[in-house]
UniProtKB/Swiss-Prot annotation:
Domain of life: Eukaryota
Keyword Electron transport belongs to the record: no
Segments of skewed composition (Polar residues): 163-181
Matches recorded under PANTHER family: MED-6-RELATED
Biased composition (Low complexity): 182-202
UniProt main location, coarse: nucleus
Name of the featured protein: Mediator of RNA polymerase II transcription subunit 6
Organism: Scheffersomyces stipitis (strain ATCC 58785 / CBS 6054 / NBRC 10063 / NRRL Y-11545)
Signal peptide range in chain numbering: none
Stretches that traverse the bilayer: none
Family: Belongs to the Mediator complex subunit 6 family.
GO-annotated molecular function: transcription coregulator activity
Listed GO biological process terms: regulation of transcription by RNA polymerase II
Region Disordered, residue ranges: 163-232
Length: 263
């Protein structure tokens, strides 16, 4: 356990808790069993003295209070109870006692339930937070670099890489172009301009529709020529037949007119 970092481990003694429990009166003794304890401290020396000497504790004073008062009278490294909140929380402070009124804090430890931890230093906390922030920032910058590409047509770096997919992947671009061309060739329709060779025929229900394509144009041209010939024949039959002006079957008879031929 000596090779491990003390701020990365936790320690507890279930045997001590089961036998004696844990309270403010014995919490320093419980802490002295942990690897965080310094056996060269004044606590260890004072405990050895109390073990082999008869100590007269003043009236209305607990052993823990008397022990803490004796520690303040000594100079050197000591462990004291800095804060307690029974029954499950204590803060043990390691400090350099200069005199009964002055001390320099060296390290804090806290006990939660039966577990003992070493409190991290401010330097370690800030280093960990800054390292985490820098790592996240680096990942974000790498992601932004992957999202942008340099294109001469854009005049610099651009986030719109969709329009440059054909440039980055020529094979895919060619295949896409072929598929688009095939689709347009199969489904696209355009209006055919009216010429003398492809006349537009007018039927009783409205103008006829002119379709594009070589086959359709040829069919329309053929049908247009046939229709033109039939129309010419009809006009010839209508206007060139010999219809008498007077007499049976004449225009005057069909219109029901009376004409005075003697005048």
């Amino acid at each position: 356990m000596s090779g491990e970092a003390l701020d990365e481990i936790q320690w507890k003694s279930p045997e001590f808790i089961q036998e004696r429990g844990l309270h403010t009166g014995n919490v320093l003794e419980y802490f002295s069993l942990s690897p965080f304890y310094d056996r060269t401290s004044n606590n260890q020396q004072l405990m050895m003295q109390f073990q082999f000497q008869q100590i007269q504790i003043p009236v209305n004073t607990t052993f823990q209070q008397f022990f803490q008062e004796k520690l303040r009278e000594m100079t050197g490294v000591v462990f004291v109870i800095a804060y307690n909140r029974e029954p499950d929380f204590w803060i043990i402070r390691k400090q350099l006692q200069l005199d009964p009124q002055n001390a320099v804090t060296l390290q804090d430890y806290y006990i939660i339930g039966a577990n003992v931890y070493q409190a991290p230093k401010v330097y370690d906390v800030l280093s960990s937070r800054l390292l985490s922030s820098v790592l996240q920032l680096r990942n974000s910058i790498d992601l932004l670099n992957k999202m942008t590409q340099f294109h001469v047509s854009d005049g610099g770096h651009s986030y719109n890489n969709a329009i440059h997919q054909s440039t980055s992947n020529p094979t895919q671009g060619q295949s896409s172009g072929k598929s688009i061309s095939a689709t347009v060739g199969n489904t696209g329709t355009t209006a055919t301009p009216m010429t003398m060779q492809t006349p537009q025929t007018v039927g009783p229900n409205g103008p006829a529709t002119v379709q594009s394509g070589a086959n359709s144009a040829a069919a329309i041209s053929k049908n247009g020529s046939t229709s033109s010939a039939e129309s010419a024949d009809d006009r010839k039959n209508i206007y060139l037949d010999d219809i008498p002006l007077y007499g049976r079957g004449s225009t005057v008879e069909m219109l029901g007119l009376k004409v005075n031929l003697e005048s």
